[in-house]
């Protein structure tokens, strides 16, 4: 017991008698505050000179009394759950073994190593405890009682981990996933880098089917060739595209060179009698054994599924591209227009107002445009003679063709033209009128044609007569939106949304000034109101709407009503209220208010009316009907002014 720590009754520094500790050299008795100060200042012991670095305290440990209870230690890695009594969760602990079965002693011994399952009643939180330590390990629980510890033997130590609510992969499944990830993520990239660095000779060049004599059975597959790089360079240079260049280099490594001749398209997309059904031939010795990969996991070329993708036949060109090539050949043979000539023709057509027919006939082929070129040039000559010169119009060359007065030999399928003896002129003008209501550009063009036709000969004026109606409507549809037009639209349809109203005048709301004027008119004459379906729509502020009729009559009636309606109503006077009360003796409050309801709109009007009523009238109960009526307070003969007004009325 000589080595035991002997503490004095008080601290040597401050004299405190509570919370005492001994120094590491066991010579000094210090409280916690003085010991912390000496450790921070690196003070030394007064007797031995040892620097004070820590404080110690000794306890007696005794064995616990024998009991039948078994104790276990549980360690929670992710944090201790809420085990308080007041918590809402109720926890249960069980072994991960089948329930309700009888086990032998040997089976029970094996089941001791099974993990514990700790879960709450909701099943949301679940922990699994695994046995920690070896079978011969011994654990004790140190529980402090008074000033000594009690050592309680514990059976086992369990580490509890939270059970994941998602599916967990096994070790084999995880390895397979990582292998596929490496193969698809960077294996293909590394293989491509290796092929690019070493060139096509890495896998060996093969002969083209054409040079090998078109032998059957091999399906276009040849043998290794030392001079195959020149042909590959020729194919790449013919394409001139980066993507196709990569594709060509890849196919050259696999022995699948594409034929460069365009006159053998009938034989298939690749040319020749290539048989792609023979998988054994396609996956032959040249591909599998010429290149030896050092890394088996990242040998992308050894994957049979990926080899099938690489050996797949080339997708044929779309029919549109093939059609364009045929058209170019036909143009060269027949001496038609080139691409620059077509672009010039389109620009001339747009300048002469022919872009309408271009939009309607976008799906026509180039061959039809070539056959109708003479007719189109004739119509452009006539329309150019009718129109006045415009500053921003480009200079138009005069193409050769028949004279202006003679009709063309063939009618154009893709272009519209006005003829002198055309019997279908009114119907075409109606269709054009319907289009011009939604197309401001076409309306401006027709208006310009109409003004020019008035100064020409009578026969030309008859030609442009069907276009006069859309021209007049287009002239009215230009400029800022007026208040009358907005009123007419709101009266046509009771429930008009803001989006529908804006779409009506979208063509005329181009500038910022037009939009601001439109918004100001809307705030002035309309308001937002909700219907039964909680949808907002725009309505006029006036309650009564005119009867349906023509647009002009509606606007005129609306203007008359707005002019007749007084701008500001006068206040109700005392003489007027007296006059009403004397006309009818038994008048209720509601009836009196209804007489002047139209003039009681503002708070000022209502306050003045109430003040006059309190001054000259009072409520009196009618004995016959048990109702309160309004009567004058003086209940005398009316004033002379009142009698005079009554006689006049």
Curated annotation (Swiss-Prot):
Record's compositionally biased regions (Basic and acidic residues): 380-389, 434-449
Cell compartment(s), UniProt: Nucleus
Compositionally biased spans, kind Pro residues: 396-410
A Gene Ontology biological process term: transcription initiation at RNA polymerase II promoter
Compositional bias ranges of the Polar residues kind: 450-459
Pfam families: TFIIF_alpha
Keywords: DNA-binding, Nucleus, Transcription, Transcription regulation
Compositional bias annotation for Acidic residues: 229-247, 274-283, 293-308, 323-335, 355-371
UniProt keyword Phosphoprotein, yes or no: no
GO cellular component assignments: nucleus
Subunit structure: Heterodimer of an alpha and a beta subunit. Interacts with CPL3 and CPL4.
Family, per entry: Belongs to the TFIIF alpha subunit family.
Name of this protein: Transcription initiation factor IIF subunit alpha
Organism annotation: Arabidopsis thaliana (Mouse-ear cress)
